[in-house]
A protein has these predicted regions:
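Fe(II)/2-oxoglutarate oxygenase catalytic core
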Residues: 1-2
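N-terminal acidic leader/helix
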Residues: 8-13
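Conserved short histidine dyad/triad with adjacent acidic residue
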Residues: 16-33, 67-68
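Short, conserved beta-strand element in jelly-roll/cupin
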Residues: 32-48
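Ligand-binding loop in jelly-roll beta-barrel domains
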Residues: 67-87
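Short, charged/polar surface micro-motifs in flexible loops or helix N-caps
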Residues: 25-26, 43-46, 54
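Short acidic-glycine-tyrosine-enriched beta hairpin
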Residues: 51-68
Length: 87
């Protein structure tokens, strides 16, 4: 998926304007967000752990997190960069 396609899809799904996130290598312990999030990885990688399940998302992958879902984040050796829609 390209950035333009993501923007169009998010608008159709009622997400607010995109926010661009850049994270350095590292991690965030388990936490939640008060919003639903859908993002397209542009560079780097992010590992999302939900319960015992961990998935890795790399450039070109899209991840979707419901609001209030406990999860942990770990960023690859080059960090991660992605636009994300929130609602």
């Amino acid at each position: 998926m390209q950035r333009e396609a993501l923007v169009a899809a998010l608008e159709r799904e009622g997400f607010a304007a995109l926010v661009t996130v850049t994270r350095e290598p590292g991690a965030l312990d388990e936490h939640t967000h008060p919003f639903e999030a859908k993002a397209l990885i542009l560079s780097g990688e992010i590992h999302l752990r939900i319960g015992d399940d961990e998935r890795c998302y790399r450039a070109g992958d899209v991840f979707h997190l419901p609001a209030h879902l406990p999860h942990a984040e770990r960023y690859g050796p080059a960090g991660v960069h992605y636009p994300v829609g929130r609602k």
